[in-house]
Amino acid sequence: MKILSVLLLALIICSIVGWSEAQFTDVSCTTSKECWSVCQRLHNTSIGKCMNKKCRCYS
């Protein structure tokens, strides 16, 4: 049971750190494919996702 608690805590910490790497944009979108060129142009990365109708870029 202790190991499960430690693994759960590690997962939560890693998730929080991962979220901080996201960079938000004000560019509207309907599909994630639309964000790829936006992220490349604005943040020099092609990893992007459409969330809540806004592009979100990851490094």
Swiss-Prot record:
Transmembrane segments: none annotated. Has the structural arrangement of an alpha-helix connected to a beta-sheet by disulfide bonds (CSalpha/beta). Potent selective inhibitor of high conductance (maxi-K), different medium and small conductance calcium-activated potassium channels (KCa1.1/KCNMA1 and others), as well as a voltage-dependent potassium channel (Kv1.3/KCNA3>Kv1.2/KCNA2>Kv1.6/KCNA3>>Shaker/Sh). It blocks channel activity by a simple bimolecular inhibition process. Belongs to the short scorpion toxin superfamily. Potassium channel inhibitor family. Alpha-KTx 01 subfamily. The lineage of its organism: Eukaryota, Metazoa, Ecdysozoa, Arthropoda, Chelicerata. Expressed by the venom gland. This is Potassium channel toxin alpha-KTx 1.12. InterPro entries: Scorpion_toxin-like_sf, Scorpion_toxinS_K_inh. The record marks K49 as: Basic residue of the functional dyad. SUPFAM superfamilies: Scorpion toxin-like (SSF57095).
